[in-house]
Amino acid sequence: MGCAKSELLILLEYIDRECKDYESCKRIIVELEERVKKIAFVEAINDLF
């Protein structure tokens, strides 16, 4: 499962808008990392069944 081009553009616009300094960029990266882990976990569970 991937993301559509429009979803990626929305994500990039969000990062561009919110990433103003080191701390805000770090927060965004950590948040994205957690979301990716959750999605990967759900996909792995779905693959088992």
From Swiss-Prot:
**Protein name as it appears in the record:** Uncharacterized protein B-49
